[in-house]
Amino acid sequence: MARDSPSSADVSSGDFVLPYVPLIPYNATNPTGGDSLTQDLNVYYTSGDIAWLLTSTALVLLMIPGVGLFYSGLARRNLTFSHTAGPFIGNLENIGLKDVLARPSVGSARVPDLLFAVYQCMFAAITVAIALGALSERGRLLPSLIFAFIWSTVVYDPIACWTWNPSGWVYQLGGLDFAGGTPVHIASGSAALAYSYVLGKRAGYGTQKLNYRPHNVTHIVLGTVFLWVGWFGFNAGSALSANLRAVMAAVVTNLAACMGGITWCLIDFRLERKWSTVGFCSGVIAGLVAITPGSGYVPAWAAVVFGVCAGVACNFATKLKYWLNADDALDIFAVHAVGGCVGNLLTGVFAADYIAHLDGYTQIPGGWLNGNWVQIGYQAADSATGMAYSFAVTCIILILLSFVGRFIPALRLRVDRAEEEQGIDDVEIGEFAYDFVELVREVRPVGFADDGESEIGVGGEDRSHSRATMVRGSKEASGESYPLQAMGRTGAMG
């Protein structure tokens, strides 16, 4: 049985020969990432910083199902961080995690490359998850997975590189984006708008048939909770260290979320005289999006302004899709792209040098609070470039995939009209969040059957719920059938 270290008895008896040599201190300039057999790779780093970033990684991972729950409820029924890089994208020095082990990361010398890579992988994943909300009710799954890989490589990676890599043009210009206002939110929101254009409008768009109504408020609340909790890892974790700057990022994140939710809810109440749970949750997400770029730069009181401005701007931006003539079913562009732009611009106003220096080493000229009037221009340039690049390249990717789909039916971006009417869950997955067949079996009277047959159709094939009919018991012998009708409030069928 193998043992990690010799026991005291073995050493005292003199019968044990040490199977190892004392490890030498790790040389952080080693280009290979270190050798754990000859070097102590742990002494270079603080265990608290590593523990915090590991926790933040898990929190950001939690955001991915949070996005799924949030948008499913709303629906109707890092390769860029190279140590040597250009101003637009990194290189392939560390492809396949080559030599990524204990060398200090380009993001911070306080955490190793390997941990930083995993953390940034979560950022790329959540960004793609947000953008793919544009598939709602009409997009195919397989081509979207191919799109996700291509998009994260040629859209997310370059934007993340020019924003955060010390060699990136926005970084060199002086743009401030602490946790992803442009790479994550503006990029994903713009991509969702492009995806909506290329896919086209849903069947029945503009008619009462598509009158918007969230089908599951519980999912929306659960998704919001997941996202809210995960955002602490998203923003505070971007400090890449357990320090006061991370604490301040957590504080402003929570304040902006609260104020965004309250503001959106108040706007909806003014129009509808209802305290909307969906409105509050949407406002929370808007506030979280807006505070993302400024979370490590702005004081606590400024977070209130971020939340209020985001709640107002994103609420009214939900009407932009009609002006843009786009079927953005889940308002991803309004909340993420517009919210990201609001956050970027407000960061240029409220960024404070003393907040950034809470980590002990970051120095910035600040924003308007420090008299740096040009900062908002840098922020606007970053926002506009990120939006234009993401939208244009996303359109190119989708047009190419659509062209390929003409020859390979499985890669068609959109389901056909009949499949759309049948439902994406049925056509693409064959599984359902809610089994209406079971509901029918529970509520129908004894003697009713589907299509005049037993619950298992001819040849043992299950009857599809989409074609279910009911036979009145009194006419069962004749086999006369009637379409399945909805149950009224009194319990009667009609």
Where on the chain are the PLM-derived regions?
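Glycine- and aromatic-enriched membrane alpha-helices
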Residues: 2-494
